[in-house]
Curated annotation (Swiss-Prot):
Protein name: tRNA-splicing endonuclease
Family label: Belongs to the tRNA-intron endonuclease family. Archaeal short subfamily.
Keywords, in A-Z order: Lyase, tRNA processing
Origin species: Methanocaldococcus jannaschii (strain ATCC 43067 / DSM 2661 / JAL-1 / JCM 10045 / NBRC 100440)
Catalytic residues (UniProt): Y115, H125, K156
Listed GO biological process terms: tRNA processing; tRNA splicing, via endonucleolytic cleavage and ligation
CDD domains, per database record: tRNA-intron_lyase_C
Gene: endA
Amino acid sequence: MVRDKMGKKITGLLDGDRVIVFDKNGISKLSARHYGNVEGNFLSLSLVEALYLINLGWLEVKYKDNKPLSFEELYEYARNVEERLCLKYLVYKDLRTRGYIVKTGLKYGADFRLYERGANIDKEHSVYLVKVFPEDSSFLLSELTGFVRVAHSVRKKLLIAIVDADGDIVYYNMTYVKP
């Protein structure tokens, strides 16, 4: 695992559908890299973010018995808590690896919000809303139109991420065009 410049692993505690970090130094390091959301005196990470950070070797997650969970153990837990976890994790990992800043898109009915590489997220808005689908999914054209309209109404573009059975991802950039 690559530790990059994080040094010692940061400890988080599994709490339902999120992982909580209380260590001030850990909060500072992770929030500076745009992971999680600072909520008072702690940082809240999504399960997808926590899995990604465990995979990087930056985070260890503890549960009830205070024993660190492996990536596989957290993954199995998270699959029972979050729909389409595997697909979302693959897309999150791919986008983060490409240098994008990825945040939750829940408030917009999307899986993620995507910021440009190097964006100052305190001063700039996200550019894309990302919706993740398995390759074999289907939806009505009216549903797709609805996704695009929501993105347009909040001045964002829609990125549809299609994940195939091998874990390969194809992205489709959708924009609203007024006839």
